[in-house]
Design a protein with these regions (language model features):
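A eukaryotic "domain-to-IDR transition" signal
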Residues: 94-99, 112-114
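Long, hydrophobic N-terminal alpha-helical segment
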Residues: 26-67, 71-88
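Outer-envelope beta-barrel architecture signal
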Residues: 23-27, 38, 48-52, 92-94, ...
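Transmembrane beta-strands of outer-membrane beta-barrel pores
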Residues: 33-37, 56-62, 100-106, 154, ...
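Residues on the lipid-exposed face of transmembrane beta-strands in outer-membrane beta-barrel proteins
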Residues: 40-44, 83-87, 98-100, 148-154, ...
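Extracellular/periplasm-exposed beta-strand and loop segments of Gram-negative cell-envelope proteins
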Residues: 56-83, 105-145, 174-217
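Outer-membrane beta-barrel strand-turn architecture
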Residues: 46-50, 89-91, 154-158, 226
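Cleavable N-terminal export/targeting peptides
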Residues: 1-25, 211, 226
């Protein structure tokens, strides 16, 4: 285990390195918003036409969907960590970008059932019973997702101060993994039908989304060069 003294030295060296890079004019940061949520990135000059960019993006979105079977609470979480290289082939603000992204994007749903129809049969709940709820989870197939894209804005070419950045690209998250489960059903025979319906719906959704392996990325932001 790393000692507190060793950790303190590592933090101090990292801080001194960042200060040195910042003083050399080879460090810039940007904040932005887009389909990956709110983002914060830092760019470091590697070569005259190549920047390394590291960042974090996060946003949580919630909504309620209404259906005849019940109301569904939907919670979507955008959570990614970027490790990217920006290449400027024409010595201007246009750049090609590639890299790897830790992809923690996910969707969680909870449907509180107030009724159910399955294969033409409408099930009624005896007094004091309940269909419970159906929990759903949507997770990406690749926790480490490749990214390719283009963009405009070189945060390290202008003088100290503010600038603009933008990105358009594709995040290859792989085949999504969708799971559904029923919980808390006490409605007797209706529970058996519910389990079958949930299993069929899970298979249908996984089949429907099997080919949707990319996530579109579009971002715009403001940068600051130190």
């Amino acid at each position: 285990m790393m000692s507190r003294k060793t950790l303190s030295k590592a933090c101090l060296l990292s801080y001194l390195l960042l200060v040195r890079v910042a003083n050399s004019g080879d460090l810039a940061g940007d904040v932005g918003i887009g389909t990956t949520g709110l983002g914060l990135h830092a760019s470091i000059l590697l070569e005259t036409d190549i920047n390394a960019r590291f960042g974090v993006n996060y946003m949580k979105l919630s909504t309620i969907m209404h259906d005849t079977d019940g109301d569904t609470n939907v919670d979507a979480t955008l959570n990614t960590l970027d490790a990217l290289l920006d290449w400027f082939p024409h010595k201007n603000s246009f750049h090609l970008t590639g890299g790897l992204v830790y992809n923690g994007n996910k969707i969680d749903t909870v449907t509180k059932l107030n009724g159910m129809t399955y294969k033409g049969t409408t099930y009624s709940m005896p007094l004091g019973t309940s269909l419970g709820e159906v929990d759903g989870k949507f997770n990406v197939g690749n926790i480490i997702s490749p990214y390719i894209g283009i963009g405009w804005g070189n945060v390290l070419t202008h003088t100290t101060g503010w600038g603009l950045t933008s990105d358009i690209g594709l995040l290859f998250h792989g085949k999504p993994q969708i799971t559904l489960s029923s919980n808390g059903c006490t409605a007797g025979p209706a529970c058996v039908a519910l389990i079958a319906k949930v299993a069929n719906e899970e298979a249908r959704l996984n089949d429907e989304y099997a080919g949707k392996i990319v996530y579109p990325v579009a971002r715009i932001g403001a940068s600051y060069k130190f």
